[in-house]
Every structure is written in structure tokens, then in C-alpha cells.
Regions:
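Short beta-strand segments within Ig-like beta-sandwich modules, predominantly Fibronectin type-III
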Residues: 438-442, 552-557
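Asp-box/BNR beta-propeller loop motif
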Residues: 429-436, 543-551
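Predominantly extracellular/luminal regions of secreted and cell-surface proteins
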Residues: 298, 483-502
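Short coil-to-beta strand junction motifs in C2/discoidin
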Residues: 417-425, 530-539
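Non-catalytic, beta-strand-enriched accessory regions in extracellular/secretory proteins
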Residues: 393-399, 505-513
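Short, surface-exposed tryptophan/glycine-enriched loops
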Residues: 447-457, 562
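Bacterial Sec-dependent N-terminal signal peptides
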Residues: 1-26
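Mature catalytic domains of secreted/periplasmic carbohydrate-active enzymes
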Residues: 23-451, 462-482, 486, 522
Length: 562
């Protein structure tokens, strides 16, 4: 299977671009392998010529996409279902997919991506593979199809459409019988990719827990991706794919230095674990493409970042979170640190039990859209779209519109000619003369930097360091109204970290130092590890002396942590 995986998923080609009076350049599409004896300079040259596929470039240009977590969990109040839920509880009273798409379209989103099946195995379409679906629910007397309704709404409002299909299925009896379940999963995937028009993104996550029989599954990624390539060849394959990678967190934070031309080998390749371990990189690593990394690498991938985060604390709708929708300031910060950090933002907006995007979310999305529109409809730079071929140390001066006050600058590279900028500085000409207002490392498709507002007449952009010649496609400057964080009262009174200590790791044992009253606890794994050891199911015990333990009714599982 490993050899098949490498053969069927190794997508790399060389193209030559040029025109009348232009020097032709060779480009490597999606992947480049370095010769064994390549010097660092040769690797830098080849890295500069790595470019996205047309699908990857089109995906990057969407900038803002929406996740719709909706399903049986919406009605149980859980984040991860166990597959034992009764389909009878799925009964949205006012489901309106057009309201979803219309709301998101008005807010500037370019694609919606639906959880057609989450880990609980409940399917939002009337699949022929299982009875654990909408066909067994009272919604529309078992005749409903959420996927179809969303597809039709996307067609009506000219919105791109994507699907999330969980490989982990806690309901399927065949899960853990690897060949049988893989065939089962491919039938589900085939239904989604043949019955619902064009699919622009297929999203698989890496969760792989036990099924109802207590067994784990070995996924046939090779067969899954062949199915996608045959049925939806224009779709990008995200996360457990080689078109789009996970940024490494669910907080909405990209990297300040975000390389799309990365040394990280996608996990679907059999060699990925060995390659990434040798380089010391993983999805959360900060450095994925520096010269130091190139020196150690044997190959490079065009593998851009997708930043996924929920507008609420949870991924599925919970009524108690209606007052906890992220503030406008929080969303703005996320936007600048995702889209503004050379990534695509995938913002989750979960429909409620009625089957509507909740009023609290709609209001915030409208505020978010109005805020962005006010900023980005008034570019202060004159002639900022003039192409600029920049080498290390070169600079260009741009005139600003009269009486311009700015606090945001934006740079863009033409990524169809590679990602090349490694360091830049921006200065503004004020009444006091030239002053530095912004600096950064990578640019890529889009880089935005915020700074204290200044009044200026000109901008001077300097490319301090780049690979070969950087193709700057736009320089822009804007003014963003300052936002203040909302004051919220949380009913948490966490014990100071200095007041307790860990005395054992397995089972995890904490000495609180004194007798305290507890009402809740939180848990998070270490962030610095590539594959940290994590608790999934738990029981909770308390003791007055560390010897005699009493179980309290707090057993469960940490959903959405793996």
C-alpha cells in the first residue's frame, strides 16, 4: 500500500512561463525534490520556483470560508457523539439552508463547508450505507436531505460548496474491520461526490478513535484520494490531504512567518513521519520553510495554511453559548492573524436546533462584514496595484491620497510565480520625516501589518531579503477603527497554578496543598509536542489524604481534543 500511496499521490510537474520580452522561468507545481548534492543556494532557487496548482491558487483567493457544524450533536448538547444516539432526536423545526447561505454571502464568505457526517456517524443525507441518517429521523418524515438543501442554496446564491466527512465513525459496526469499513466509507464519499454537483473542498480530519467494537481503523487514504480525484478532480483536499494543511491550532492564529512553500511532508505520504521527524517539524511547528530548514530538507511542498476556529466556544450549537459569541474585536484580530498571515480563514458558524444561524451569530457576522468593508473599500495608496519585481535590498515609494491617516499596510505576492519575500520594511513619510511603521518576514498571497495610526503622504516599501526576484502584485494602506474588547463576567475562579502541583502522571494526580471546594476542572494537553500523550476518557476522584479516594460523578470524555 505504501508504494501505491506514493505513486498515486505524487503530483508534481514543471511548467515554463514567459512572454514577449520576458525571460522564461521554470516552475515546479506543488512539489519539488532536491538533488542529493544540491547546495543551499540551489535549494533556495528551486524553492522560489515552487508554485500552487490552479485549484490551490483559487482556494487561497477565497480568503474567508465558513464551517457549518450541524448534526445529531446539535440536539444532544455534545461536541463528540458516541454513535448511540437515536436519530429520532434530529428534528430541526425551521431548517433554512438559504438563510445560512444568504447570511454568509452577505458577510463576505466565499464557500460553505458542511459536516455531512461527524464522528457519531449520523449522516445528513439519506445514504444507502446506514440507517443512522436523516432518513430515520422525524424531520420531514424521513424525506429530508440537508446536503441537498445546502447545495441548492449555494447554487441560488453563487456560493462555493464543500463537505466534511469524518473517517472516524463511532456508529458503523464495520469500523475497525479495515477493508470492510474502507469500502463502506468510499461508498459514502462517492454518494457525496456524485449526487450534489461540484464540490470545491473535501475536508478530512485526523481523528482515529475506537469504533463501537472497540477496534481502531487503518484508513486506506490512497483509495479515498483516488475516489476524490476521479469524481471531483477540481476539489482541494484539506487537512488529511496534500492541498491544504491545518495551521496547527483552533484559536484562529496563523504564524507571522507563514510559508506556503513548506518542508512539512503531508501526512498522507508514507514517508511523512520519517521525513518530519528527521527535520523536527509537525503541524504546530513555528518554522516550516526557512533557509535553515531548506538546508536540511530533501523536498518541498506547496502546502498552504487553513486557519479553523469557531465563532463560539464550541463547534456545535449550544444555547448556553449565545452570550459567548466572539466579540467584533476578537474576530478582527483573528482575521488579521489568518488572512493577513498568508492563510485562509475557515470560521465555524453552527446552526441552532431550529436549523437557523442564530440571531446572535447573524448580528456579529453583520458587524464583522461592515467593519471589513469600511476598512478595505478605501485604499489610501495610489497606483498600488502596479507590478513590482523586487530583489533583495530594493525599494519603491508609493504616493498616498491627500490627508491620509493609516494604521494597516498590506503586501501581496503573485503566488503563481512563487513565494519569495523573506523580510520587508515599510516606512511612512510624516511631518517628522520618514519613520518605520511596519516590518515583517513572509508575504505570500497576502500579508497585513497593523501599527499605531500615522498621517502620511508617502509609503516606502523595502524588500530586505527575498529568494530570486519577488513578484509584488499589490501594496495597499488602510485605516481600521480601533476596537475595544467587551467586558464579560465569567463564573470561573481558577486556583493559581502556584498553589498546586502534579505528583503523578498516570493516573494524573494533583496535590492541591490544602482543602478546597471544587465545582469544575479544565484539562489541556501539552502544546509543544508533535504527538502529545492525551487523556480521552476520564473518571474523577478526590481524597483528603492522598490514600483513600472517592469517585465523584464527573466521568466522561474530552471531546474534540485529539
Amino acid at each position: 500500500m505504501m508504494n501505491k500511496l506514493l505513486t498515486s499521490l505524487f503530483l508534481s510537474s514543471v511548467i515554463t512561463l514567459g512572454g514577449c520580452g520576458l525571460t522564461k522561468e521554470n516552475y515546479y507545481v506543488k512539489h519539488v525534490e532536491f538533488p542529493q548534492d544540491a547546495t543551499l543556494e540551489q535549494k533556495i532557487d528551486m524553492a522560489a520556483r515552487l508554485v500552487p496548482t490552479p485549484q490551490q491558487a483559487a482556494w487561497q483567493q477565497m480568503e474567508l470560508t465558513a464551517f457549518l457544524h450541524f448534526g445529531i450533536n446539535t440536539f444532544t448538547g455534545r461536541e463528540w457523539g458516541d454513535g448511540q444516539e437515536d436519530p429520532a432526536i434530529f428534528n430541526p423545526t425551521e431548517l433554512d439552508a438559504e438563510q445560512w447561505v444568504r447570511t454568509l454571502k452577505d458577510a463576505g464568505f466565499k464557500m460553505v463547508l458542511l459536516t455531512a457526517k461527524h464522528h457519531d456517524g449520523f449522516c445528513l443525507w439519506p445514504t444507502a450505507t446506514t440507517k443512522h441518517s436523516v432518513a430515520s429521523s422525524p424531520w420531514k418524515n424521513g424525506q429530508g436531505d440537508v446536503v441537498k438543501e445546502l447545495r441548492n442554496a449555494c447554487d441560488k446564491y453563487d456560493m462555493k460548496f464543500g463537505v466534511y466527512l469524518s473517517p472516524w465513525d463511532r456508529n458503523a459496526e464495520c469500523y475497525g474491520d479495515s477493508p470492510k469499513y474502507n469500502e463502506f466509507f468510499i461508498r459514502q464519499l462517492t454518494e457525496l461526490l456524485t449526487n450534489y454537483g461540484e464540490v470545491h473542498e473535501v475536508w478530512f480530519d485526523g481523528a482515529n478513535g475506537e469504533g463501537p467494537n472497540g477496534k481502531k481503523q487503518i484508513y486506506d487514504w490512497d483509495a479515498f484520494y483516488k475516489t476524490i480525484q476521479q469524481l471531483q478532480p477540481k476539489a482541494v483536499m484539506a487537512i488529511m490531504g496534500d492541498d491544504v494543511r491545518w495551521v496547527g491550532n483552533e484559536k484562529g492564529l496563523g504564524r507571522e512567518t507563514e510559508w506556503s512553500a513548506t518542508v512539512l511532508t503531508p501526512g498522507i505520504y508514507a514517508r511523512s513521519e520519517e521525513n518530519n521527524k528527521r527535520l523536527g517539524v509537525f503541524s504546530k511547528a513555528e518554522d516550516l520553510g526557512s533557509r535553515a530548514m531548506l538546508e536540511k530538507a530533501t523536498e518541498l511542498f506547496w502546502y498552504p495554511s487553513e486557519v479553523d476556529v469557531s465563532i463560539r466556544p464550541g463547534w456545535f450549537y449550544h444555547a448556553e453559548e449565545d452570550s459567548k459569541v466572539k466579540s467584533l474585536k476578537h474576530l478582527a484580530d483573528i482575521y488579521f492573524q489568518s488572512v493577513g498571515y498568508n492563510s485562509v480563514l475557515l470560521l465555524n458558524i453552527p446552526p441552532d436546533r431550529r436549523g437557523l444561524i442564530n440571531e446572535a451569530d447573524v448580528q456579529r457576522l453583520n458587524e464583522f462584514a461592515a467593519y471589513r468593508e469600511k476598512i478595505f473599500t478605501n485604499n489610501r495608496v495610489e497606483k498600488g496595484r502596479k507590478d513590482w519585481e523586487a530583489v533583495s535590498g530594493s525599494e519603491t515609494v508609493y504616493s498616498l491620497k491627500p490627508e491620509s491617516e493609516i494604521n494597516v499596510v498590506m503586501l501581496q505576492e503573485d503566488i503563481t510565480k512563487g513565494q519569495r519575500v523573506e523580510s520587508f520594511t515599510v516606512e511612512a513619510l510624516t511631518e517628522q520625516g520618514w519613520q518605520e511603521v511596519a516590518k515583517g518576514t513572509t508575504v505570500g498571497y497576502k500579508r497585513m501589518v497593523r501599527f499605531p495610526a500615522v498621517k502620511a503622504t508617502q509609503l516606502r516599501v523595502k524588500i530586505n531579503e527575498c529568494r530570486l526576484t519577488a513578484h509584488i502584485s499589490q501594496v495597499a494602506a488602510y485605516y481600521a477603527d480601533p476596537l475595544e474588547e467587551e467586558n464579560r463576567t465569567e463564573n470561573w475562579n481558577n486556583l493559581p497554578r502556584a498553589s498546586w502541583k502534579q505528583v503523578a502522571a498516570s493516573p494524573l494526580t494533583i496535590d492541591l496543598g490544602k482543602e478546597v471546594e471544587l465545582s469544575a476542572f479544565t484539562y489541556a494537553p501539552l502544546k509543544a509536542e508533535a504527538k502529545p500523550t492525551m487523556a480521552f476518557r476520564y473518571k474523577f476522584y478526590v481524597s483528603a489524604d492522598g490514600k483513600n479516594w472517592k469517585e465523584v460523578p464527573a466521568n466522561g470524555e474530552f471531546s474534540n481534543i485529539m
